[in-house]
Amino acid sequence: ERMIVIPTMNTNHEKCDPLLKLIQDLDDTHIIATVHYYGEWVFSANLGITGFDEAIDDDGKTARTAADSAMETVYKTFTQNDIGVVIGEYGVLGYDQGEKCNQPGEELKYYEYVNELARKYGLCLMFWDNGSGIDRVSGKYEWKKPQVGEMLWASMEGRSSYAAELDTLYFGEEAEEDVLVALTLNGNTFTEIEGLTEGEEYSYDESTATVTLSKDYINKMYAESSREGRFGELVFTFSSGADWTEKLVRFKTPEFKEASGTT
């Protein structure tokens, strides 16, 4: 039989208690609750906080700890009281803007972790797509952001691994030393960097879960690039979960110069 879904006020996870009372008073096992979750506003819409683990306030709150609090609240209010929950929409508010808004790797960490919390607390997730996620025009039904699609599919089954820092390494000149990339494994093991030779172009320290990229390899790639922008993409693979792509970017510091005209 079909279930009736009732939302909290404004589908807000902070307004759970009134809905709990309503559902309990109705005493109907065919009623479930729903909330929507788009993460912390300043992270989700990139209002100055780009990192999933970047402090939002002086208390050390992050987008990750905010997700912890939100999902725990929903679980303790509804699930522990035998009321099913559907997260009827989740995502990030800046998704429509492509990579212009949310930092891609940090967005992936968000999806990975929200799925982990949903498994932990027995919640059902529904990814909100208003046309920005899946191509429905060509008939191919492919993800417009393939890495998002891969992460979402993988995260429904288990955890994925990623770099502890950003998914981008910036170089304003040739590297003077090897480059370290610390990994957050989440229970998996590192396998390889696709197309590279371990022991020559990179090495891996299992005890610290750190990949070391050879400066000779970096500088070779850097020298082959003739202009600012992305000059390499390194695909890290693991024993389970989605792959992780680390981008190599060549940049030049902007310079202020004289200009003329009207404003």
Q: Where are the predicted features?
A:
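Surface-exposed cleft-lining segments at the edges of enzyme active sites
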Residues: 47-64, 97-99
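Active-site region of glycoside hydrolase catalytic domains
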Residues: 1-50, 54-56, 73-92, 121
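Extracellular/luminal ectodomains and secreted, surface-exposed scaffolds of diverse proteins
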Residues: 198-214
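Surface-exposed, short loops/turns at beta-strand junctions within beta-sandwich domains
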Residues: 215-231
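Catalytic-core region of carbohydrate-active enzymes that cleave or remodel glycosidic bonds
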Residues: 63-124
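Aromatic-rich peripheral "rim/lid" segments of glycoside hydrolase catalytic domains that contact
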Residues: 97-194, 227-245, 254-258, 262
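Short acidic, gly/pro-rich beta-turn/loop elements at beta-sheet edges
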Residues: 14-16, 43-45, 135, 193, ...
